[in-house]
Amino acid sequence: MKTMKSVLPKAGMIFLIFTLLYGVIYTGVVTGIAQLIFPDNANGSIIEVDGKKYGCELLGQQYTDEAHMWGRIMNIDVSTYTDENGKALMYAAPSNLSPASEEYAQLVAERVEKLRAADPDMDETAVPVDLVTCSGSGLDPHISPAAAEYQVARIAKANDMTEDEVREIIQNCTDGRFLGIFGEETVNVLEVNLMLDGILEK
């Protein structure tokens, strides 16, 4: 029977080898490949212009003024989490409300009313569902082309632009289906708003 004394050195050697192999070499190679081939994705898909960071293209930002495009409802809780200086931090979480609950129905109704008031020219058009519901993450950066089109008249008027100019920006910020067949077309709200502000080129 092998003693513990004879087994431990071998076990320790195997542990060190696999730690070096998978903890250092493997992760280093994968990180290097990612930085070489997909540097933007590997570094968080941050939108940066002239050295200033404006956000991540994969995380939604909340816009409420008439001159910008509105995204999906965001679930934000800053009541509990603060940094060392007491500044509130933003955290998002999926909604736990049932679609059949009265509270959820009230939230949807309030959102519809707000959109109707902001976009009176679209009074006869049904409000796209993604403008009045939360996403699973609570921070979805995209909306449907229909939801973007619903806001064109308001955005054009607020920015003294033509509706076709706004549609051109939306088209430039629209992602197609994956491989042309999977998923749906989506519009990145942050990119649209940065183009409206003249920060990103059209």
What are these regions (language model features)?
Residues 149-202:
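Extracytoplasmic/periplasmic C-terminal soluble domains
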Residues 14, 23, 30-151, 158, ...:
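Flexible, solvent-exposed loop/hinge segments and secondary-structure transition points
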Residues 6, 106, 110-113, 164, ...:
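Solvent-exposed alpha-helical segments within well-ordered globular domains of core cellular machineries
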Residues 1-2:
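Short, Lys/Arg-rich, polar N-terminal cytosolic tail immediately upstream
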